[in-house]
Structures are given as C-alpha cells and as structure tokens.
Amino acid sequence: MDRRNFFKFSAVSALGATAVEAKALPDKQIASIIDIDLCDGCAKETMPLCVKACKIKNEPIFPVPKEPMMDYWPQTKHEDYSKQKDNISRLTPYNFTYIEKLEVDGKMLHIPRRCMHCDHPPCQKICPFGVISKSEEGAVDIDKNFCFGGAKCRDACPWGVPQRQAGVGIYLKVMPKLAGGGVMFKCDMCKDLLEQDKKPSCEVACPKNAIKFGKRDEIFAIANEMKKTRFIYGMDENGGTSTIYVSSVDFNKIDGAISKKYENKPKMGIMDMKKHPNPMEKSEFLAAATLVAPLAAIGAASIAVIKSVKDKK
C-alpha cells in the first residue's frame, strides 16, 4: 500500500469505522452450551481438564515478555503475569478459561468461564487500531501481532475478559515509551479448529459433556427447550452471545455469590453473571466510539501498511 492509498484508506475508514463490523455467516455460525449442572470441576484431577486442554492448545501463543518492562505512560505501573503462569483461578494472558467454584443454596457449582463471543462485540467497536475481528463461525479474536495493548477492549467488555501482558507486542518496535502497553489475550474459540470442522479443545477434554459446541440454530433450539425447566444465561446478555449457560440455580443468585466471594478482593480476570445490556447502547460508550473512529481508521491504515510491507519481504 503506497502513501496515496494509505490516506485514501484512512479517509474511507474514518467515515465508516463506527458502522463497519465483520459479520459471522449464518450458515457457519457456531455457539456453545455450558451445562453447569453437569460440571464437577474435574474434582479428582489436579487441574480441570478443560483448563488444561486450553493451556496446552494455546501455549504456543503465550507471551514471552522482554525485560525491563515499560510502565504505561503516563502511569507508573504495568501488568505482568509472567510470574503467574500457573494461576488458573481467573483469566490471565496465560489462562483463557477458569472454573468458578461457588456454593449457592447449599449446592456446589463449578462454572467454566471464558470469552462469551458476543454477537455485537463492543470490544471490536471500541478498539482504536481495528485489530479485533469476528470470524465466519462467530469467534471474536484479537490479532496479537498488531495489538498495542491499550486495554480499551477490556474497558468496553461487560465481563472484562481480555487480559494484558506488558513487555510484548508491536508497540515495542513503534512507540515503546509513548503508546500501548503490551498485548491483550483471550479465548478465540479455537477458531482454527472450527475452520477445520473440529471441536474446540475444551469440549473434547470435558469428561462430563458439560460443554457442547454446534451450529448456532441447533444450540439455541436446545437452549430454548432447556429454559422451560431451568435458567439460562448468555442468550440476551450484551445484546446476545454465542455462549449459553444452563443451570437449575437462578443466575441472579449465582451472580450474588460471585459478588460476595470477591468482595474486597482483586477482581481483575473475574467474570460476573449480571444481566448486562450492550454497553455500546449507552451514551458514554457511543461517544467514546465516535471519538475513537478516526483513530481506528488511522490505526487500521497503519497496520495495513505494515502488513503490506511485511508481505513483500
């Protein structure tokens, strides 16, 4: 891409940055059901098998930070999980799924948590560099090669899913002291496996069949039948998602238990179960998205140039 096309691309993108969004194809869309009543957290295992399978699958993309790590200018801090790689109690750049253990009304619950893969992901809309995409199957993914780690995606996500690791990423080569802060990491629904018509690692590893992926219309039909006798979560939250939870316990009670468990404790990487509306419908987020649009256009154009140069080498 030459200089003229760069500016042309920027101008066109600026006009449509808030409206353009990658769409999953209806005939290829995948969704999942997580049956909380079936999950026992792999009580006899040293690590829940879905968590273990996820870590093994994604180990090749785990960050290897460069020392010393820069603080997030103008702040005097940075996020570093490189000494906590074995922490499976929450989402981190080295752990894309975890099991939330709760006791509600005398019943023990084990809830697999990871990215919900929203129908209209606010993280994608708010990203100032346009590096978050949605696959034909509906998987929401972050391009780790071009993410600056600004964490706007985490701010926009109702569940705070994406997690940041400092000391890695393109910002080290572009503006190590003035922009970014690393790379954001999260579950990508094993989109490479989905593209091959294979099942995600977490489903394959689950010994209780508590995790089930399938064609979206089929999964939603199952969920609609289940909600006649049980509670569901994820079908309407944040404007709709591709992850549906089913439980015999009311999700309002589950969310209350989560809030109580983490009261006065660090909540980074911990997902709640509130009935979230889509934050992009709120005026403050719409305003933020409008302000970010020109940046997204320039960022997307810049990344297109970098990719073009890289492809020519």
Model-derived segments and their meaning:
Residues 1-313:
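Non-ligating segments of multi-cofactor redox enzymes
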